[in-house]
Amino acid sequence: IQPSDEVLEIGPGWGFLTMALAQRAKGVTAIELDPLLAEILPTRFLAAGFHNITVVHHDVLSVVINRPELAEKSRLANITLPSSYKLVANLPYSITSVCLKRFLAGEVARPSLMVVMVQKEVAERLTAKPGKMSLLSLLSQYYSDPHYIADVPAANFWPKPQVDSAIVSLQLKQPSLSVEDEKWLWRLARIGFSSRRKMLKNNLSAGLLIEESAVSNYLTQVRQNVNCRAQDLSINQWIELVGVFKNNMI
């Protein structure tokens, strides 16, 4: 965090991390769903000498960034931040995937960097390598460069949760495909991962109603074994596969 940074924090809790961020950043906007905390926190921050923290009482899934026209149309809350803002979050496990998708895929204005604490299993999926890929892996690695930072054992929390957590950083990057080609990417990926135990050629053949031999040929063109499963392909191979399918099916 640099002195010129504006930070969006999701779920400040009692504000300990919020104040640490505010010591380094130009400003911090904290989104808090709990009405009691949202009422208490502004007074707490001012009493501690912080005048660069704004608390927004709202559900993060009902907030948009720099989209006032969408906010008005959809009755959402709009938050105005610089285009290079950074996001820090201790994400509730129940909304992790939905929340990550909103900020990665641009349903709200995308941050330049995300640092999130998530369930350890989710952190491993975000940063997975070929052989263990998933739809969430593709999402994170298409829109960002994710890095597994550190484990946070359950024993570090009170009350102690049932699972361990981990910290992941996601440096966002410009998508490499056009909007139309992205539709192809997610269509192929959804079909490909529809049955993880089946070979990818079987899933794509059945889902797209094309010959299995044709799919095998397409997989060979992206340097992949024809008996592979969806989780075996890297993000770059999925992107290449989009071009191969488009060239042969349009």
Regions found by a protein language model. Name each.
Residues A166, L170-L172, L177-A214, N225, ...:
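An accessory alpha-helical subdomain
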Residues I1-W184, L188, Q231:
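Catalytic cores of RNA-modifying enzymes
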Residues Q2-E6, W14-L17, L208-I250:
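Peripheral terminal appendages
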Residues N52, N66, N78, N90, ...:
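Detector for Asparagine
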